[in-house]
Amino acid sequence: MNAAGCVNEEKKLPIIPQPLQSVYPPETVESKNSAPTQLKFAKEHDVRVEKYALDYLGNQDVGLINLSIEDANIDLVSVGVSEESYELRVLESAIEISAGTTWGAIRGLATLWQVAKQGRLNSGLSIRDEPRFLWRGLMLDVARHFIPLNTLRETVDRMSLLKFNVLHLHLSDDQGFRFGSKKYPEVVSEAFYSLQELKSLATYCMDRGVRLIPEIDLPGHVTHIVASRPDLAPTGRATDRTQKFGVHRACLDPSNENVFIFVRELIEELSNVFP
């Protein structure tokens, strides 16, 4: 999100990242009275917004949230910066969030979560915001250091609340191959993510406004693959698997037709898992 300051520069809101514009009421204005969180939608909405609000704000007792979403059918892959914009207003009777898309509404709810956690829900608070950058990503190298699925989900939770929108998962390298290929199980590491686990993680990410982007390293960085499939290497000889960091010589043979079959079928398998 844009790092521009508030209208009152001395009263910046404790929000990460700082919103594009915000107006904070005077100190004399008391915090809004707490009440059980309720949702009211002005029109048809994406069920993901409702689930997001209840998951993160259900126990915050922020009272009534009036949500207005202009177009709930825009896919996350297609959104631009302006489609993630939102406006948030705290009134005495309710909290209002208006957004052009599902994803803007989710960003607004993330801001509301941050404000509510710090007891700053004062009547008169208003925020207008949109991202400064289209790609706000985090890359995790699970090839060299396997990360349990539950930890990945917890990471996605925190990413979403801080308005990151891309999780780049580095699934393979010389030290490991974590994509649980059913077509080529011989190249898969002992610790890996099954296809169903990755599908589930992709859905979990999308429900929180985060795209899951997989990476399989080819034709280099393939020591782990060549150790099981020496027929794909230029030398035709197996390499020893390694956990050492650094430069490794293993690569796939571009003159070998079987390499193209291997790569094509692997990518087809990958594309069936990730939206």
Model-predicted segments: where are they?
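Acidic, contiguous N-terminal accessory segments
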Residues: 1-131, 136
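Feature activates predominantly on carbohydrate-active enzymes
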Residues: 76, 81-275
